[in-house]
Amino acid sequence: PVKNNIPQYTTVVSTGIGGIKLTIGAEVDCVWNYKPNLKEGDKENPLNHYVELKTNSIINHPKSLFAFENKLFRTWAQCFLVGIPKIIVGFRDENMILRSVEEYETEKIPILIKNNTFQSDNNNGGNGGKKNVPKFMPSIKFLGGFLAWLNENIPKDDENKAWKLKYNSETNKD
């Protein structure tokens, strides 16, 4: 295995989904403009200044748009849960040269994807004209339900015990 000794910056936040409270750690890619200095009494929330960085190939056909929207959905979920407000995507060509940069506000991504007019025509990723938009709120509700199930079903009497959950996509089809 290759070791990465590059320093990483992480943040830890307390959040909740439904009645479940979570403490989540996340790597932060960069700070947009400045990082408030909490040691000096700055009361501003540092999360407001954090940014997630992504790269993507230039979108030049329906399948690449479909792949990008799925990537943006996964990035949205990560940033939404932690509270990172901005995502910056660099679009590169086939020679890995950066050609354009787009900024996205995390909270606006569900509407952006839902209102994508290209999604509603017959060319969206080769799935026969079926509108295939990521389900943002159902995904969060599923996570909340799953965490509630875990909370109810995993015994809390032995904190040293590890649990392994498995999902078999072959037996758990829609």
Put a short name on every predicted segment.
Residues P1-D174:
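Accessory terminal regions of nucleic-acid processing enzymes
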